[in-house]
UniProtKB/Swiss-Prot annotation:
InterPro entries tied to this protein: ACOT8-like_C (IPR049450), Acyl-CoA_hotdog (IPR042171), Acyl_CoA_thio (IPR003703), cNMP-bd_dom (IPR000595), cNMP-bd_dom_sf (IPR018490), HotDog_dom_sf (IPR029069), RmlC-like_jellyroll (IPR014710), TesB_ACOT8-like_N (IPR049449)
Any GO molecular function: medium-chain fatty acyl-CoA hydrolase activity
Family matches, as Pfam families: 4HBT_3 (PF13622), 4HBT_3C (PF20789), cNMP_binding (PF00027)
Swiss-Prot/TrEMBL keywords: Fatty acid metabolism, Hydrolase, Lipid metabolism, Peroxisome
Binding of a nucleoside 3',5'-cyclic phosphate, residues: 15-83
Catalysis performed (reactions): a fatty acyl-CoA + H2O = a fatty acid + CoA + H(+)
Enzyme's top EC category: hydrolase
Entry EC number(s): 3.1.2.20
Name used for this protein in its record: Acyl-CoA hydrolase 1
Transmembrane segments: none
Protein family (similarity comment): Belongs to the C/M/P thioester hydrolase family.
Length: 425
């Protein structure tokens, strides 16, 4: 049995579905194959625990002494598991093979591999965006997310945080060989940065090649955000690409967003109110390095085309190569500057506008690295009835189209949106 087959098997074990693929690969490298004939004891009651057993083939039975008052038998089959129990370092029951049986044994020395740390479980130091995406497991399909003190907030939970955390929660419930290829989400209520967010995952479908999940994000008992995601096992098929990456300066030649904003703050030709607003933006940390392709001297008081191009990548190297992690980070970054470009043709001096994301969709076409440069090309084809619509394409440095996106936002003039736990509309 090759490593890939072992990883695929482990990805179907409920206990392990909350772990990233890197953990499953490491577990597959250290598990021991154990074979038993019918009637053999796998473990004996009061025997010292030697690890966690995963049933690969065949069936087994859990037996307690027949003389006990509450004598019970529990059948075990493929994907079931057992190990440490309430009695600590000894097994609490006999486990007997009722057919020819094959188990994978994760020795106690490697039990730390079962611990959950984040989307990635690497022991390396995590960068800020990984800390933001960290989820605490509460139950099999329930996770708790937080808004760290150094996370971008803008007075409320940043929309990309909801997207990234919800997608991370969904990814933890899918076997590791299936990777998200698209998702659609809706922003329902403003999130409160001062309280945790509960992510409840619903397993809608698990097929041979595809899996579907829905996720509801809740605060104070109310659903503030919902996401539907589809996952697919890697397959061979037709390949073509019509979209061409536009010519742009290399990201290394462009100013980081923070440095560009610093220059705008001290530019005397710009309106004072605008410079004060920029100063506020600088104070908000953002874990993504952004480089705008065109000189951005807009005061948000002048009309401009509804288009934008910028390079982006995570600040710092991500601790893992797991595609689940990288796609969650790209999803996190995608909400910062997107449908708001629909405002560009309508700006004028003194105009006050509020913009809030309504829905957001992404399609992943090819593997991505969120800690390497990606070009985000955005166009807004229309705005109507207080809604702006934008489409986006993301290219890697090879010119490959890796992600397609759409977003719609509500755009309102002369409305002040106060941070609150209320409806977004």
């Amino acid at each position: 049995m090759n490593t890939e087959s072992v990883v695929e098997f482990l990805g179907n074990v409920t206990l392990l579905q909350r772990l990233p693929s890197s953990s499953l690969k490491r577990i597959s490298e250290v598990v021991v194959f154990k074979g038993y004939d019918r009637g053999d004891y796998v473990v004996r009651e009061n025997q010292n625990v030697d690890g966690v057993y995963f049933l690969l083939q065949g069936q087994a039975q859990v037996l307690r002494s027949a003389g006990e008052e509450n004598y019970q038998e529990f059948p075990l089959k493929r994907y079931d598991f057992f190990g440490h129990g309430i009695f600590g370092d000894v097994y609490s029951a006999d486990v007997v093979a009722v057919t020819e049986l094959t188990c994978l044994l994760l020795m106690s020395d490697h039990r730390a591999l079962l611990e959950i740390k984040s989307v990635s479980d690497s022991d390396k130091e995590r960068c800020l965006v990984e800390d933001i995406l960290y989820l605490e497991p509460l139950d099999l399909n329930v996770y708790r997310g937080f808004t760290p003190p150094n996370a971008p907030t803008y007075g409320k939970v940043y929309g990309g945080q909801l997207v990234g955390q919800a997608l991370a929660a969904a990814s933890k419930t899918v076997e590791t060989m299936k990777i998200v290829h698209n998702f659609h989400c809706y922003f329902l209520l403003v999130g409160d940065i001062n309280i945790p967010i509960i992510y409840d995952v619903n397993r809608l479908r698990d097929g041979n090649n595809f899996a579907t999940r829905s996720v509801d994000a809740r605060q104070k008992g109310k659903t503030i955000f919902t996401l539907f995601a589809s996952f697919q096992k890697k397959q061979q098929g037709f390949i073509h690409q019509e979209s061409t990456m536009p010519h742009t300066p290399a990201p290394e030649t462009l100013l980081p967003r923070e440095e560009m904003l610093e220059r705008l703050v001290t530019e005397p030709l710009l309106p004072r109110d605008y410079r004060n607003q920029v100063a506020t933006e600088i104070s908000v940390p953002f874990p993504i390095d952004i480089r705008f392709c065109e000189p951005n001297r807009s005061t948000k008081q002048n009309k401009s085309p509804p288009r934008l191009k910028y390079w982006f990548r995570a600040k710092g190297k991500l601790s893992d190569d797991d595609q689940a992690l990288h796609r969650c980070v790209v999803a996190f970054a995608s909400d910062l500057i997107f449908a708001t470009i629909s405002l560009n043709p309508h700006r004028r001096e003194g105009m006050s506008v509020a913009a809030l994301s309504l829905d957001h969709s992404m399609w992943f076409h090819r593997p991505v690295r969120a800690d390497d440069w990606l070009l985000f090309v955005i166009v807004s084809p229309t705005a109507t009835e207080s809604r702006g619509f934008a489409t986006g394409k993301m290219f890697n440095r090879k010119g490959e189209l890796v992600v397609s996106l759409t977003q719609e936002a509500v755009l309102r003039e002369a409305v002040t949106i106060k941070p609150s736990f209320g409806a977004k509309l």
